[in-house]
Amino acid sequence: MASRARWFPTAGKVWLDGIELTALGDKDLREQRRHMGMIFQQFHLLMQRTALDNVCFPMEISGVPKAKAKERAKELLELVGLADRMESYPAQLSGGQKQRVAIARALATEPKVLLCDEATSALDPNTTAGVLSLLKDLNTRLGITIVVITHEMSVIQEICDRVAIIDGGLIAEEGGVEEIFRAPKTKIGQELVMHEGTNREAYTGKLPYSYRLVFKGGSENEPVLGQMMIELKNVVNILAANT
């Protein structure tokens, strides 16, 4: 994201699809930016333009012929579920609809990567669920890589395959989502994953005579604890639970 804005790290390199962005000149970097779309917490739509014209805007800058840009913008608005709001202005749209316009605009130049910077932080839970469902669908349908930047762990659980936890500008922990949520190894990872009031030792296996159960793949609907008590002829106590 920093490289897209022409901010480069003080150390290290940034690569995209086999190309080192940190080694590119201005002209080549501008070309690579076309392969990166971005959506934000605030939608940054042009208030004097319709939804259709907002989606056309990046194509206008790239020199795409007007008729071709308009046709693609219509296709993208249909893709994000706003076929009936193309001529609406941002002030006439809900927060979720504005974010869908922003997503369509970010896809206008056919990027390889979509960067989502706190894209659902300003939305209510129901609207957030709809936007996340759309992003998952776009990932599957278009084969586009989606990079999500968020402090909402529920968002990570919902749509991500892998997660990197950053602390003080450094990657503290990285791995598959299920792996990180099941057994975070670092202090910052445990603080992010566990709910307030949860004993951290429960995540490390160091709490005496206690076990942490993780349900996956619909197994939460199975009577696991009840069956265990019947078979072992013993009782268990649930110290804490979360989703």
Functional labels for PLM-detected ranges:
Residues 181-212, 232:
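C-terminal boundary and immediately downstream tail of ABC-type ATPase nucleotide-binding domains
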Residues 1-139:
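ABC family nucleotide-binding domain
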Residues 156-158:
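A short, surface-exposed alpha-helical micro-motif characterized by mixed small hydrophobic
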Residues 174-175, 183:
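ABC ATPase "signature
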Residues 207-243:
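Non-catalytic connector elements of ABC transporters
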Residues 41, 143-149, 151-152:
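Conserved H-loop
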